[in-house]
Protein backbone atom coordinates (compact mmCIF):
# COMPACT_ATOMS: atom_id res chain seq x y z
CA UNK A 1 0.00 0.00 0.00
CA UNK A 2 1.18 3.53 -0.80
CA UNK A 3 0.39 6.68 1.17
CA UNK A 4 1.31 10.26 0.27
CA UNK A 5 0.95 12.93 2.97
CA UNK A 6 0.60 16.57 1.93
CA UNK A 7 1.42 19.17 4.57
CA UNK A 8 3.46 22.30 5.31
CA UNK A 9 5.76 20.35 7.65
CA UNK A 10 7.07 17.25 5.85
CA UNK A 11 9.84 16.72 8.43
CA UNK A 12 7.18 16.22 11.11
CA UNK A 13 6.78 12.60 9.99
CA UNK A 14 10.45 11.58 9.84
CA UNK A 15 10.87 10.04 13.30
CA UNK A 16 7.52 8.19 13.63
CA UNK A 17 7.92 6.66 10.17
CA UNK A 18 11.43 5.43 10.90
CA UNK A 19 10.77 3.85 14.29
CA UNK A 20 8.47 1.22 15.81
CA UNK A 21 6.22 -1.07 13.80
CA UNK A 22 5.58 1.48 11.05
CA UNK A 23 9.29 1.88 10.37
CA UNK A 24 9.77 -1.88 10.18
CA UNK A 25 6.80 -2.27 7.83
CA UNK A 26 8.21 0.42 5.53
CA UNK A 27 11.65 -1.21 5.49
CA UNK A 28 10.12 -4.58 4.65
CA UNK A 29 8.04 -3.10 1.82
CA UNK A 30 4.63 -3.84 3.31
CA UNK A 31 3.90 -0.12 3.40
CA UNK A 32 5.18 2.95 1.57
CA UNK A 33 4.71 6.43 3.07
CA UNK A 34 5.96 9.64 1.48
CA UNK A 35 5.70 13.12 2.98
CA UNK A 36 5.41 16.03 0.54
CA UNK A 37 5.58 19.79 1.05
CA UNK A 38 2.64 21.83 -0.24
CA UNK A 39 4.98 24.84 -0.47
CA UNK A 40 6.61 23.27 -3.52
CA UNK A 41 3.44 24.29 -5.34
CA UNK A 42 3.27 27.78 -3.83
CA UNK A 43 2.62 30.84 -5.99
CA UNK A 44 5.17 33.42 -7.07
CA UNK A 45 8.75 34.02 -6.03
CA UNK A 46 8.01 33.46 -2.34
CA UNK A 47 5.98 30.26 -2.89
CA UNK A 48 2.86 31.64 -1.23
CA UNK A 49 0.41 29.00 -0.01
CA UNK A 50 -1.86 30.98 2.34
CA UNK A 51 -3.91 34.17 2.38
CA UNK A 52 -6.47 35.90 4.59
CA UNK A 53 -10.06 34.62 4.23
CA UNK A 54 -12.90 36.80 2.97
CA UNK A 55 -15.24 35.97 5.84
CA UNK A 56 -13.09 35.57 8.91
CA UNK A 57 -9.80 36.03 10.74
CA UNK A 58 -6.47 34.23 10.55
CA UNK A 59 -5.03 32.62 7.44
CA UNK A 60 -6.32 30.00 5.02
CA UNK A 61 -4.52 27.63 2.67
CA UNK A 62 -5.15 28.77 -0.90
CA UNK A 63 -6.98 26.55 -3.37
CA UNK A 64 -4.44 26.58 -6.23
CA UNK A 65 -1.35 25.24 -4.38
CA UNK A 66 -3.42 22.54 -2.68
CA UNK A 67 -5.10 21.43 -5.91
CA UNK A 68 -1.80 21.36 -7.80
CA UNK A 69 -0.14 19.34 -5.03
CA UNK A 70 -2.92 16.74 -5.06
CA UNK A 71 -3.03 16.47 -8.85
CA UNK A 72 0.73 15.98 -9.03
CA UNK A 73 0.45 12.64 -7.22
CA UNK A 74 -3.14 11.57 -7.77
CA UNK A 75 -3.73 8.44 -9.83
CA UNK A 76 -6.80 6.81 -11.30
CA UNK A 77 -7.52 4.71 -8.19
CA UNK A 78 -6.25 7.15 -5.57
CA UNK A 79 -8.43 8.16 -2.63
CA UNK A 80 -7.88 11.69 -1.28
CA UNK A 81 -8.67 12.23 2.41
CA UNK A 82 -8.72 15.55 4.21
CA UNK A 83 -8.03 15.34 7.96
CA UNK A 84 -10.65 17.61 9.47
CA UNK A 85 -12.67 17.85 12.73
CA UNK A 86 -15.74 18.16 10.49
CA UNK A 87 -15.19 14.73 8.95
CA UNK A 88 -16.48 11.26 9.74
CA UNK A 89 -15.11 9.95 13.02
CA UNK A 90 -12.31 7.43 12.50
CA UNK A 91 -13.18 3.91 13.63
CA UNK A 92 -11.72 0.42 13.42
CA UNK A 93 -14.20 -0.36 10.64
CA UNK A 94 -13.14 2.70 8.63
CA UNK A 95 -9.45 1.88 9.21
CA UNK A 96 -9.95 -1.63 7.86
CA UNK A 97 -11.80 -0.22 4.85
CA UNK A 98 -9.01 2.25 4.03
CA UNK A 99 -6.36 -0.45 4.43
CA UNK A 100 -7.75 -2.11 1.31
CA UNK A 101 -7.00 0.96 -0.85
CA UNK A 102 -3.95 0.82 -3.09
CA UNK A 103 -3.09 4.53 -2.81
CA UNK A 104 -4.12 7.15 -0.28
CA UNK A 105 -3.43 10.88 -0.37
CA UNK A 106 -3.73 12.44 3.08
CA UNK A 107 -4.22 16.20 3.10
CA UNK A 108 -3.31 17.98 6.34
CA UNK A 109 -5.08 21.17 7.30
CA UNK A 110 -3.19 24.21 8.59
CA UNK A 111 -4.10 27.63 10.00
CA UNK A 112 -7.88 28.12 9.79
CA UNK A 113 -8.31 25.42 7.17
CA UNK A 114 -8.35 25.14 3.37
CA UNK A 115 -10.23 27.06 0.68
CA UNK A 116 -13.48 25.13 0.18
CA UNK A 117 -13.02 25.08 -3.60
CA UNK A 118 -9.96 22.86 -3.26
CA UNK A 119 -11.88 20.41 -1.10
CA UNK A 120 -14.81 20.33 -3.51
CA UNK A 121 -12.56 19.76 -6.49
CA UNK A 122 -10.19 17.09 -5.17
CA UNK A 123 -11.14 15.60 -1.79
CA UNK A 124 -13.05 12.30 -1.72
CA UNK A 125 -13.64 12.09 2.01
CA UNK A 126 -13.06 13.99 5.25
CA UNK A 127 -12.03 12.11 8.39
CA UNK A 128 -11.80 13.27 11.99
CA UNK A 129 -9.89 11.60 14.83
CA UNK A 130 -12.05 13.25 17.49
CA UNK A 131 -14.19 16.18 18.53
CA UNK A 132 -11.33 18.57 19.19
CA UNK A 133 -9.08 20.89 17.19
CA UNK A 134 -5.31 20.45 16.72
CA UNK A 135 -2.73 23.04 15.67
CA UNK A 136 -2.48 21.23 12.32
CA UNK A 137 -3.50 17.99 10.65
CA UNK A 138 -0.12 16.25 10.80
CA UNK A 139 -0.80 14.40 14.06
CA UNK A 140 -4.19 13.29 12.71
CA UNK A 141 -2.53 11.95 9.57
CA UNK A 142 -0.13 9.88 11.69
CA UNK A 143 -3.01 8.49 13.72
CA UNK A 144 -4.80 7.45 10.53
CA UNK A 145 -1.67 5.82 9.07
CA UNK A 146 -1.04 3.89 12.28
CA UNK A 147 -4.67 2.78 12.62
CA UNK A 148 -5.02 1.44 9.08
CA UNK A 149 -1.51 -0.05 8.92
CA UNK A 150 -2.53 -2.70 11.46
CA UNK A 151 -4.85 -4.23 8.88
CA UNK A 152 -2.24 -4.44 6.11
CA UNK A 153 -0.83 -7.99 5.82
CA UNK A 154 2.78 -8.14 6.94
CA UNK A 155 2.72 -5.04 9.14
CA UNK A 156 2.00 -6.79 12.45
CA UNK A 157 4.10 -9.71 13.58
CA UNK A 158 0.92 -11.56 14.53
CA UNK A 159 -2.02 -10.50 12.37
CA UNK A 160 -4.46 -12.29 14.67
CA UNK A 161 -3.74 -9.77 17.42
CA UNK A 162 -5.55 -7.11 15.39
CA UNK A 163 -8.71 -9.20 15.51
CA UNK A 164 -8.82 -9.17 19.33
CA UNK A 165 -7.86 -5.55 19.98
CA UNK A 166 -10.30 -3.09 21.52
CA UNK A 167 -13.10 -1.87 19.22
CA UNK A 168 -12.36 -4.37 16.46
CA UNK A 169 -15.62 -6.20 17.21
CA UNK A 170 -17.34 -3.11 18.55
CA UNK A 171 -16.36 -3.76 22.17
CA UNK A 172 -13.50 -2.78 24.44
CA UNK A 173 -10.86 -5.41 25.04
CA UNK A 174 -10.88 -7.15 28.41
CA UNK A 175 -7.99 -7.24 30.93
CA UNK A 176 -4.68 -8.85 29.96
CA UNK A 177 -2.24 -10.79 32.16
CA UNK A 178 1.28 -12.21 31.88
CA UNK A 179 3.85 -13.72 34.30
CA UNK A 180 4.18 -13.88 37.25
CA UNK A 181 1.03 -15.77 38.18
CA UNK A 182 0.72 -13.78 41.43
CA UNK A 183 1.75 -10.12 41.78
CA UNK A 184 1.45 -8.28 45.09
CA UNK A 185 -1.12 -10.78 46.24
CA UNK A 186 -3.32 -10.55 43.15
CA UNK A 187 -3.60 -13.68 41.03
CA UNK A 188 -4.32 -14.19 37.37
CA UNK A 189 -7.98 -15.32 36.91
CA UNK A 190 -8.13 -19.10 37.19
CA UNK A 191 -10.08 -19.46 33.95
CA UNK A 192 -7.01 -18.31 31.99
CA UNK A 193 -5.00 -21.18 33.47
CA UNK A 194 -7.51 -23.97 32.86
CA UNK A 195 -6.47 -24.76 29.29
CA UNK A 196 -10.09 -24.88 28.07
CA UNK A 197 -10.11 -22.60 25.03
CA UNK A 198 -13.90 -22.34 24.89
CA UNK A 199 -14.15 -21.31 28.54
CA UNK A 200 -11.42 -18.75 28.01
CA UNK A 201 -13.18 -17.36 24.93
CA UNK A 202 -16.49 -17.13 26.83
CA UNK A 203 -14.76 -15.37 29.73
CA UNK A 204 -13.07 -12.88 27.42
CA UNK A 205 -16.39 -12.10 25.76
CA UNK A 206 -18.16 -11.60 29.08
CA UNK A 207 -15.54 -9.29 30.62
CA UNK A 208 -15.36 -7.41 27.32
CA UNK A 209 -19.11 -6.77 27.48
CA UNK A 210 -18.94 -5.73 31.13
CA UNK A 211 -16.02 -3.37 30.59
CA UNK A 212 -17.68 -1.77 27.55
CA UNK A 213 -20.95 -1.28 29.42
CA UNK A 214 -19.12 0.33 32.35
CA UNK A 215 -16.67 2.55 30.45
CA UNK A 216 -18.34 3.19 27.09
CA UNK A 217 -22.13 2.79 27.35
CA UNK A 218 -22.50 4.36 23.91
CA UNK A 219 -20.46 1.54 22.33
CA UNK A 220 -22.26 -1.06 24.41
CA UNK A 221 -25.67 0.08 23.22
CA UNK A 222 -24.48 0.32 19.64
CA UNK A 223 -23.13 -3.24 19.83
CA UNK A 224 -26.28 -4.50 21.52
CA UNK A 225 -28.48 -2.82 18.92
CA UNK A 226 -26.49 -4.20 16.00
CA UNK A 227 -26.47 -7.74 17.37
CA UNK A 228 -29.96 -8.01 18.86
CA UNK A 229 -32.42 -10.35 17.20
CA UNK A 230 -34.44 -8.73 14.43
CA UNK A 231 -38.00 -7.87 15.48
CA UNK A 232 -40.46 -8.35 12.64
CA UNK A 233 -44.01 -8.28 14.00
CA UNK A 234 -46.02 -6.19 16.42
CA UNK A 235 -46.32 -9.17 18.77
CA UNK A 236 -42.51 -9.29 19.02
CA UNK A 237 -42.42 -5.75 20.40
CA UNK A 238 -42.56 -5.71 24.22
CA UNK A 239 -43.93 -2.69 26.04
CA UNK A 240 -41.40 0.07 26.68
CA UNK A 241 -41.56 2.08 29.89
CA UNK A 242 -41.06 5.84 29.59
CA UNK A 243 -39.69 7.84 32.51
CA UNK A 244 -41.76 10.98 33.07
CA UNK A 245 -41.75 12.51 36.55
CA UNK A 246 -43.27 15.79 35.29
CA UNK A 247 -46.54 16.69 33.60
CA UNK A 248 -46.35 17.78 30.00
CA UNK A 249 -48.31 17.57 26.77
CA UNK A 250 -47.04 17.67 23.20
CA UNK A 251 -49.02 18.44 20.05
CA UNK A 252 -47.72 16.90 16.83
CA UNK A 253 -49.05 18.14 13.51
CA UNK A 254 -49.43 15.26 11.05
CA UNK A 255 -50.53 15.11 7.43
CA UNK A 256 -52.17 11.68 7.69
CA UNK A 257 -53.83 11.16 11.08
CA UNK A 258 -54.71 7.53 10.47
CA UNK A 259 -51.17 6.65 9.39
CA UNK A 260 -49.57 8.55 12.27
CA UNK A 261 -51.91 7.00 14.82
CA UNK A 262 -51.11 3.53 13.51
CA UNK A 263 -47.37 4.26 13.81
CA UNK A 264 -47.61 5.44 17.41
CA UNK A 265 -50.08 2.69 18.34
CA UNK A 266 -47.53 0.10 17.33
CA UNK A 267 -44.75 2.03 19.07
CA UNK A 268 -46.43 2.52 22.45
CA UNK A 269 -49.47 0.21 22.47
CA UNK A 270 -53.13 0.62 21.48
CA UNK A 271 -54.30 0.60 25.09
CA UNK A 272 -52.60 3.97 25.64
CA UNK A 273 -55.00 5.88 23.36
CA UNK A 274 -57.98 8.05 24.26
CA UNK A 275 -59.28 9.38 20.95
CA UNK A 276 -56.40 11.27 19.36
CA UNK A 277 -54.59 11.58 22.69
CA UNK A 278 -51.75 9.19 23.50
CA UNK A 279 -50.72 8.62 27.11
CA UNK A 280 -47.01 7.74 27.15
CA UNK A 281 -46.98 7.27 30.91
CA UNK A 282 -49.02 8.74 33.73
CA UNK A 283 -49.43 12.48 33.19
CA UNK A 284 -47.47 12.61 29.95
CA UNK A 285 -49.67 12.92 26.86
CA UNK A 286 -49.22 13.31 23.12
CA UNK A 287 -51.88 14.84 20.84
CA UNK A 288 -52.02 14.25 17.08
CA UNK A 289 -53.52 17.06 14.99
CA UNK A 290 -54.08 16.58 11.26
CA UNK A 291 -53.14 19.50 9.04
CA UNK A 292 -52.43 19.94 5.34
CA UNK A 293 -49.19 21.82 5.94
CA UNK A 294 -47.18 21.52 9.13
CA UNK A 295 -45.42 24.55 10.60
CA UNK A 296 -42.19 22.63 10.93
CA UNK A 297 -40.85 19.77 13.04
CA UNK A 298 -41.52 19.51 16.77
CA UNK A 299 -38.80 18.17 19.05
CA UNK A 300 -39.82 15.66 21.73
CA UNK A 301 -37.42 14.54 24.46
CA UNK A 302 -38.04 11.09 25.90
CA UNK A 303 -36.13 9.17 28.56
CA UNK A 304 -36.39 5.38 28.85
CA UNK A 305 -35.98 3.26 31.96
CA UNK A 306 -33.24 0.82 30.85
CA UNK A 307 -30.65 0.38 28.14
CA UNK A 308 -32.63 -2.64 26.89
CA UNK A 309 -35.66 -0.37 26.43
CA UNK A 310 -33.40 2.09 24.63
CA UNK A 311 -32.27 -0.56 22.15
CA UNK A 312 -35.77 -1.97 21.68
CA UNK A 313 -37.15 1.51 21.08
CA UNK A 314 -34.63 2.16 18.29
CA UNK A 315 -35.18 -1.26 16.73
CA UNK A 316 -38.95 -0.86 16.83
CA UNK A 317 -38.81 2.70 15.47
CA UNK A 318 -36.75 1.57 12.49
CA UNK A 319 -38.95 -1.46 11.75
CA UNK A 320 -42.09 0.68 11.73
CA UNK A 321 -40.66 3.08 9.18
CA UNK A 322 -39.10 5.78 11.35
CA UNK A 323 -35.66 7.17 10.59
CA UNK A 324 -32.64 6.91 12.87
CA UNK A 325 -30.52 10.05 13.14
CA UNK A 326 -27.26 10.96 14.84
CA UNK A 327 -25.85 8.98 17.77
CA UNK A 328 -24.94 11.05 20.82
CA UNK A 329 -21.28 11.45 21.78
CA UNK A 330 -19.41 11.45 25.06
CA UNK A 331 -20.43 7.98 26.21
CA UNK A 332 -24.04 8.99 26.93
CA UNK A 333 -26.81 6.78 25.43
CA UNK A 334 -28.58 9.37 23.30
CA UNK A 335 -30.08 9.10 19.82
CA UNK A 336 -32.02 11.44 17.56
CA UNK A 337 -34.83 9.82 15.53
CA UNK A 338 -37.49 11.11 13.13
CA UNK A 339 -41.11 10.01 12.82
CA UNK A 340 -43.14 9.70 9.61
CA UNK A 341 -43.88 13.45 9.57
CA UNK A 342 -40.31 14.54 10.26
CA UNK A 343 -40.81 15.37 13.94
CA UNK A 344 -37.67 14.91 16.02
CA UNK A 345 -37.50 12.60 19.02
CA UNK A 346 -34.41 12.82 21.21
CA UNK A 347 -34.22 9.47 22.99
CA UNK A 348 -32.07 8.69 26.03
CA UNK A 349 -32.14 6.34 29.01
CA UNK A 350 -31.71 6.76 32.74
CA UNK A 351 -28.09 6.84 33.93
CA UNK A 352 -27.65 4.61 36.97
Swiss-Prot record:
GO MF terms, alphabetically ordered: tRNA (guanine(37)-N1)-methyltransferase activity
GO-annotated biological processes: tRNA N1-guanine methylation
Short name of one Pfam family: tRNA_m1G_MT
The entry's keywords: Cytoplasm, Methyltransferase, S-adenosyl-L-methionine, Transferase, tRNA processing
Signal peptide stretch: none
CDD domains the UniProt entry points to: TrmD-like (cd18080), VOC (cd06587)
Compartment annotation: Cytoplasm
EC number: 2.1.1.228
Classification via InterPro entries: Alpha/beta_knot_MTases, Glyas_Bleomycin-R_OHBP_Dase, tRNA_m1G_MeTrfase_C_sf, tRNA_m1G_MeTrfase_TrmD, tRNA_m1G_MTases_N, tRNA_MeTrfase_TRMD/TRM10
Superkingdom of the source species: Bacteria
Catalytic activity, reaction form: guanosine(37) in tRNA + S-adenosyl-L-methionine = N(1)-methylguanosine(37) in tRNA + S-adenosyl-L-homocysteine + H(+)
Gene3D superfamilies: 2,3-Dihydroxybiphenyl 1,2-Dioxygenase, domain 1, 3.40.1280.10, tRNA(m1g37)methyltransferase, domain 2
Family in the record: Belongs to the RNA methyltransferase TrmD family.
Role, per record: Specifically methylates guanosine-37 in various tRNAs.
Protein name per UniProt: tRNA (guanine-N(1)-)-methyltransferase
Organism: Chlamydia trachomatis serovar D (strain ATCC VR-885 / DSM 19411 / UW-3/Cx)
Source taxonomy: Bacteria, Pseudomonadati, Chlamydiota, Chlamydiia, Chlamydiales
